[in-house]
Amino acid sequence: AFGGYIGENYGWQTNFFTLFIFGAIVFSLNYVYSPETIKNKNKRLTFRATFLDFRYLFGEISFLYFAGVSSIQAAFFFSMAGFMPYQFERLGASPTEFGLWFSLTSIGYIIGNIVSNKYSSWLGLERLSLLGCFWCLVSIALMCLSEIPQISTPLTLASACFMFGLGNGLILANVLVLALSSVKQKGVASASGLLGAMQMLCGAILGSLIVFIGGDSEFWLALVVLFILSIISILCCYRGGLWSKILRSKCQLVCNGN
C-alpha cells in the first residue's frame, strides 16, 4: 500500500531497500520461531529422490488440476501488480494513490480467506473453490467498466480489484489443501514445493506475456488474457473435483471390499 508513496517521495530505489529490510525481518522471525519439521536429520535429500517424487506428482491428475488452478490464480495477482499501475495512471491516479487503491485487492483477499475459513466445512472445498473461480471471472469482466468514459474512475477499477481479491481468497487456500490431499503422504513436501514453484513460474510468464502483447498500454488486451485463463481455471477446478470424487469412490469400494 505504501510502495507508491515511498517511490514517489524517496525514489523507486528506496522500495528495494524497504523490501530488503522487511525480508530480513521475516527471515529472522521464521528462523527463531518456526520449529524444524525434519525428525530424521541424518536423512539426506538427493536429486534422484526429488526427481522420483516429481515424476509421481506429474502422474496425479487431481494434483495437476488443482495445481493449475492455484498457479493461474496466483499468477493473476502477480501480473496485475505489473500492468495495473499503467491503467490507474491513465485514470489520473498518482503512484501514492495507486498504492492505496490497489491495496483493496489485498484487503479483499484477507476477507476471502476469512469467509473461506468459516464456510469451507459447510460448502466443501471443491464447491467453494469453484465459486471463487466464477467470482474472479465476474470481477475481471467488471474491470472493463474502467474503459467506459462515463464511469472510468480509480474507484471503479479498485472496486473490481477488491472483488478479485475476495475471489482469490476463496480459492487459493482451498485448492492448496485439495492439491496436497490428493497425493500420498510421502509426496506432500515435494508437492508443496512444486506448487510454489509453479505459482512463481506462471506469475513470471503471465506478467511477461501481458507486457509483450501490449497489455500495459492497451488495458483490454490484458483483460482478454485474464478472462481466457480464468475460464481455464474454472475448467481445471471442475475437472479436479470430478477426479477427486472418482478417487474417493474407488477408495471406498476398496475399503468396503476388504
Where are these regions (language model features)?
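A late C-terminal transmembrane helix in Major Facilitator Superfamily
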Residues: L178-D216, V225
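Extracytoplasmic gate region of multi-pass secondary transporters
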Residues: S62-S103, G108-I110
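Helix-to-loop junctions at the C-terminal end of transmembrane segments
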Residues: G112-E126
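Helix-loop junctions on the cytosolic side of multi-pass membrane transporters
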Residues: F27-L45, R239-S249
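Interfacial helix-cap and linker-helix signal at transmembrane-aqueous boundaries
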Residues: A1-Y10, F88-E89, Y119-S120, I210-E218
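Helix-loop-helix hairpin linking two adjacent transmembrane segments in secondary transporters
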Residues: A1-V32
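C-terminal transmembrane helical hairpin of 12-TM major facilitator-type secondary transporters
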Residues: E126-V175
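Juxtamembrane intracellular "pre-TM" segments in multi-pass secondary transporters
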Residues: P35-A67
